[in-house]
Amino acid sequence: MARKGLIQRERKRQKLEQKYHLIRRSPKKEIGKVSSLSDKWKIHGKLQSPPRNSAPTRLHRRCFLTGRPRANYRDFGLSGHILREKVHACLLPGATRSSW
């Protein structure tokens, strides 16, 4: 189980990303339209003004049950070992068992 502080930090990042989504998106569109280098630097400065944690690349997908940030399956929202336990317990329909 992940520490509660890490999960709260991730939720805070998700809220920041939603808040600054439009502010980040508009300068990215402008950079492609502008041809002069000085204008691109000005737009780049605007892009750096939002907080660092509002960038979507700083988000992790976490396991729905344990909060584990690695080895997640997007289709289920679960980490690998939890997914395996659920499949062996026949709680996920359509998934085939495997052993390793």
From Swiss-Prot:
Subcellular location: Plastid, Chloroplast
Gene3D superfamilies, A to Z: 1.10.287.1480
InterPro entries to which the protein is assigned, alphabetical: Ribosomal_uS14 (IPR001209), Ribosomal_uS14_bac/plastid (IPR023036), Ribosomal_uS14_CS (IPR018271)
Record carries keyword rRNA processing: no
Alphabetically ordered keywords of this record: Chloroplast, Plastid, Ribonucleoprotein, Ribosomal protein, RNA-binding, rRNA-binding
Gene Ontology cellular component annotations, sorted alphabetically: chloroplast; small ribosomal subunit
Molecular function terms from GO: rRNA binding; structural constituent of ribosome
GO biological process: translation
Function: Binds 16S rRNA, required for the assembly of 30S particles.
Family: Belongs to the universal ribosomal protein uS14 family.
Subunit comment: Part of the 30S ribosomal subunit.
Record-given protein name: Small ribosomal subunit protein uS14c
Species of provenance: Calycanthus floridus var. glaucus
Gene that encodes the chain: rps14
